[in-house]
Amino acid sequence: MLFQSTAARSDAPRRKHIPTALGGLRKEKAVGSDLNRYFSQMGAHVKVLEGKSPGRRWGISGSREEAPRIVLDIRRDQHGEYFEIRTGPGGRQEIVVLNVEPRERHLLLLSRQFGEREQFLAKQKFLCGHDERHWFVAAIPENEPVSTVAGAKIALKPEGVRTREGLLGISRKASFQRRNRAFIRQGEWFFVPAALEADPRLVLRNEPLSRGNGGKPHWAEECYRSGGDTVYVSARYPSGLTAEEYKKLPASERNSGFHIMKRDAAVYVRGKMSHPDHETVTLHGWHRVLMNTENRSSAMRFLAFLD
């Protein structure tokens, strides 16, 4: 599902603000070309498919009212990776590019949905960009009033990371790097140095870290968990079942590839952290694992993209 991007034009401005809406997809055919223009400024391709149901491939079910009216994904064709935006049937969509950072290869996208009677329904914001090796999409929490790429990046940082940056006096420039004195980042995971004495008997080796959405896990050379709830995880139940929920399953299903994990535990890792889409990082000493704030966003269910 992935593509070789073309380089952003060298004469492109460093920062672009696009304060006005690009228009409703149903009403203005120019929207598609405008999206192509803004995505191309960061070296990406985009395809917009209007009036298309998310379908089974996105793993989304429920009534028409419950179904997302927009779904974003990273797909791949013969030319490589591209962004795919699908808008559901019924009502009207507006897609607004709020900010483009060509040199950083990021943009902030706003989606607004209207009903068949033109009543406002909902809005979501998505950070689209390139991180290390591939394009990505991240949903921004709805309670974060961001209008720029920089603001979106800050909004995706967990509170513990923001607090530590403030205490250490991390500069704004350094705060956007993948590694500084406050943290090391790999994809959606932040690793914060921690003073910890772990019981060697409880240290796990070659342990997967997953946010439970079916994406590819990050692998920790050494992992230590403290607290949290014991859950039973399988391909069908990636977010895990409690012991009570697990016991209610038929015996045949309970024997179908479940393994026991901890949910909402304090997680610490040490050594090498690896992931096929990211550069391997080495953590010297124990680090607390914090996930970005994307899971606070209801718009996260509108993403088919899984890291």
Segments from the language model and where they lie:
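Short Lys/Arg-enriched alpha/beta "domain-start" segment
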Residues: F3-P102
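Intrinsically disordered, low-complexity, compositionally biased regions/tails
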Residues: K27, G55, S63, E84, ...
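A structural detector for beta-sheet-dominated domains
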Residues: L49, R75, R86, L110-S111, ...
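Extended, non-transmembrane interaction/recognition domains
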Residues: T87-G187, V192-A195, R201-L204
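Long, positively charged binding patches that form subdomain-scale interaction surfaces
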Residues: G166-S274
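Tight coil/turn sites that cap or link beta-strands
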Residues: K262-D277, T282-F302
